[in-house]
């Protein structure tokens, strides 16, 4: 989202959701809700959660194993503001509720994810207050450094060349041929 819209798109008090499979890499029932975290008016991170919603308006509640295209799975949303300046976007929320079979459940799932995000924000800010942003950045950088070193160790003995692999699923739910 930042790549597409820029970092200035994120504002204090805003909460976003997205379920676009081509963006998130999961099916449409997996909803990501996230919010920027600001500390002293500076963007310092994000809180996020992903949850499987029972129904997002697809042909079958819970997901469709026999769908042949994405439009049968339900509504597909790019990153969209659920809240702006700490106020819910009632039109978007109502649209979500009326396009699913279980609007009350959808709203409950959404509110649970928002509460989880607010808890994450509160705890992250308490860590910043306790240790300071410089130490948190140093710890993050050290984690990245150690991860890179371990990755390089893992591949250093692999000889140069071309490698390939094949994989199969049992079937696609529409037939019995391996895919």
Residue ranges and their predicted role:
Residues 54-63:
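A short, polar/charged loop-to-alpha-helix boundary motif
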Residues 30-40, 48:
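A short, hydrophobic, proline-anchored segment that marks a local hinge/packing element in signaling
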Residues 7-10, 26-28, 39-40, 69, ...:
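Solvent-exposed alpha-helices and their adjacent loops that cap or buttress functional pockets
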Residues 1-24, 128-179:
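Gly/Pro-rich turn-and-neighbor structural signature
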Residues 43:
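Glycine-rich acetyl-CoA-binding "A-motif" of GNAT/NAT acetyltransferases
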Residues 1-4, 37, 57:
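Feature captures the catalytic cores and cofactor-binding loops of soluble hydro-lyases/lyases
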